[in-house]
Amino acid sequence: MMAAAPIQQNGTHTGVPIDLDPPDSRKRPLEAPPEAGSTKRTNTGEDGQYFLKVLIPSYAAGSIIGKGGQTIVQLQKETGATIKLSKSKDFYPGTTERVCLIQGTIEALNAVHGFIAEKIREMPQNVAKTEPVSILQPQTTVNPDRIKQTLPSSPTTTKSSPSDPMTTSRANQVKIIVPNSTAGLIIGKGGATVKAIMEQSGAWVQLSQKPDGINLQERVVTVSGEPEQNRKAVELIIQKIQEDPQSGSCLNISYANVTGPVANSNPTGSPYANTAEVLPTAAAAAGLLGHANLAGVAAFPAVLSGFTGNDLVAITSALNTLASYGYNLNTLGLGLSQAAATGALAAAAASANPAAAAANLLATYASEASASGSTAGGTAGTFALGSLAAATAATNGYFGAASPLAASAILGTEKSTDGSKDVVEIAVPENLVGAILGKGGKTLVEYQELTGARIQISKKGEFVPGTRNRKVTITGTPAATQAAQYLITQRITYEQGVRAANPQKVG
């Protein structure tokens, strides 16, 4: 067994008995051929101990560790497993996910992973939304389309099955890092083993692509499905880990000092992780955002620490999504210099899913603030994205006196009947409703997913009395409704600007 040492949560010792990184063993045979899957070898390990390395979204790490490390300590006691977690900002290359290494019996590995998967599912869906993946691109020796056609018609592969992994959220995914030799066993001869795993579990199982020429030492297995489907698939994958004598050859949890390419965490695209997608540090992000005054709230990065993780997700997802859509951050009242605004746009563009990336980063800040007991000033609770009009009245005419939205957009704000949520009503000109809906309603759905708010638009022909404006009702937490209102308002003003520059454009 490896020597125990305190875990570091957000860079501070918590006294949790988690192992230190073992020496990084990087020497082992090249990837095993698929035929290895038919050879029943058993890796007995040390006293029946095996290793399972998984990725954990940074926003879910805090709930797994628990206050002062209590949750993870109790989990180790109950399962007999040893759990190691990379430091708070030591992410797997190309992601904002931390690496978790579990050591224990087969039963312990399954139990610990079941607990981790449950914690990830408990997080808000707007946080856990992952970047799209496609099953149409080859990632193993198996043709995924052919597998889809041969899957049995059963309760595990019917409507409840994630038949379209492109829409599968991170909450319904499992990501396991395995050595090449184990990957060969999981694939099997001609893809027979991975096909069998999918048929038996009902989940989709995809491996990061195998590169031509240079061999990666590890590959990432992505499992997509409902909780029970994923559980069965993980059990079958752990069986292959048990069979592989080399399954314990890559026990590092930090990739900071790993030289050479690393496997992509996604099953499609390049075989290699894109390290450019790694998020900036908290200090770098704070410098990027600047110390702006948002509706009278000073020092933006400092104020953020006073919000809960969910509020930060709603606020930051909204802002970062605007950047990813190409909105000019100089018009948003963030107090950014031209250089900083350009940098923010570049940072957003560098990520395949900028909204989720921002949410992860800010959720980490919230975790740090909670651990240190820091709070923002008394104005934090009254932070209002919707009132950014006061800060942006002089920017490119948006929200200025000439804008009809500045005077009459907000119809009212009240509490829901049970008092648990805010209800905000705004008026939107009939000819601009399409800008909010988007093609096939895509934009509206995306805004709801990103903010966590419910957005309803009055039916066609139902106007605010005395106007030709449709009523938009936003329901959710204060932060969610404000973020949704901000997204909608910015979308409308952007559309107005486009139409003003091009009078021939119609709604």
From Swiss-Prot:
Gene3D superfamilies in UniProt: K Homology domain, type 1 (3.30.1370.10)
Tissues showing expression: Expressed in neurons of the cortex, sub-cortex, cerebellum and brainstem (at protein level). Expressed in motor neurons, but not in glia.
Compositionally biased region (Low complexity): 150-169
Chief location: nucleus
GO biological process annotation, one example: negative regulation of cold-induced thermogenesis
Region spans: Disordered: 1-44, 139-171
Positions of short motif Bipartite nuclear localization signal: 27-43
Assigned keywords, A-Z: mRNA processing, mRNA splicing, Neurogenesis, Nucleus, Phosphoprotein, Repeat, RNA-binding
Positions where Phosphoserine occurs in the chain: 154
One Pfam family this sequence matches: KH_1
Required for RNA binding: annotated segments: 419-503
An annotated Gene Ontology molecular function: RNA binding
KH domain residues: 49-116, 171-237, 421-488
Keyword Iron belongs to the record: no
GTP-binding as UniProt keyword: no
Subunit structure: Interacts with PTBP2; the interaction is direct.
Its job: Functions to regulate alternative splicing in neurons by binding pre-mRNA in a sequence-specific manner to activate exon inclusion or exclusion. It binds specifically to the sequences 5'-YCAY-3' and regulates splicing in only a subset of regulated exons. Binding to an exonic 5'-YCAY-3' cluster changes the protein complexes assembled on pre-mRNA, blocking U1 snRNP binding and exon inclusion, whereas binding to an intronic 5'-YCAY-3' cluster enhances spliceosome assembly and exon inclusion.
Disease field: Defects in Nova1 leads to neuronal death in spinal and brainstem neurons.
Entry remark concerning the domains of this protein: The KH domain consists of approximately 70 amino acids and includes a conserved hydrophobic core, an invariant Gly-X-X-Gly motif, and an additional variable segment. The third KH domain (KH3) binds a hairpin RNA loop containing the 5'-UCAY-3' motif on targeted molecules. RNA binding by KH3 requires residues C-terminal to the KH domain.
Protein name per the record: RNA-binding protein Nova-1
High-level lineage: Eukaryota, Metazoa, Chordata, Craniata, Vertebrata
